Amino acid sequence: MNVRDLSFKLNSIFDINKYEHIDKNLNGLQVGNINAKVNKVAFAVDASFSTLKEAKGNDFLITHHGIFWSKKERIVSNMYDKTKFLIENNLALYSVHLPMDAHSVYSHSKVFSDFLGLKNSFAFANYGGVNLGIIADSVFSFSEILEKIKKENKHILFSKKFKESVNKVAIVSGSGYSFFEEALCHDVDLFITGDTSHQIYSLAEEFGVNLIFAGHYFTETFGLIKLMEDFKIQEDLEVKFICKNTNL
């Protein structure tokens, strides 16, 4: 398999062309020699310079947040340094942002809900015609759900319990607080997202909806890790997840 083959495979899985009109991220192959062989693939949330350095020695890096966020970015300053590093180390960079958020299998929100043991999930959180979140049924209490998350991530930004019983949960990974009012329409008992938001606290209190702001980084690891695990099983590739938790 070469860079072109793997890029085409990912383009097909995530149907990236569908998102050109709504996603600021430049989805797909951002940097790479399309004819280079791929044996080792790394996965990471962000294409920070520290991530690129740790990915050195791999042939292909898949990130949720790439280095190009428009089709007109200039390759200067730190962008020049990152691009130069990728080229000099023959490391291809592939980014998949909203196409992963909205994916039926690899959505961070969907995989997160599976991790929590939630059932009967359906998509919500409409953004530009695609759904970025999940609503699912719960048989667990608020305390049980919070404890399960804390076992994986000690740096939960904020949580607030208004009631212990949780029958329905809404999850939107990353910065999903703007979908809180849509979640209210589904009578959820718990709303989970990454980033904190002062503006939804009063609404949550008034409607008795529990809140967990579990961290932007943490909530956007789930789909990547599932994709990595599937690649390890389905493809003859060596895989690695690069953890650079910002605790935010």
Swiss-Prot record:
A divalent metal cation 1 binds at residues 64, 101, 220. A divalent metal cation 2 binds at residues 65, 216, 220. InterPro entries: DUF34/NIF3, DUF34/NIF3_sf. Keywords: Metal-binding. GO terms for molecular function: metal ion binding. SUPFAM superfamilies: NIF3 (NGG1p interacting factor 3)-like. GO terms for cellular component: cytoplasm. Homohexamer. Belongs to the GTP cyclohydrolase I type 2/NIF3 family. NCBIfam families: YbgI_SA1388. This is GTP cyclohydrolase 1 type 2 homolog. It comes from Borreliella burgdorferi (strain ATCC 35210 / DSM 4680 / CIP 102532 / B31).
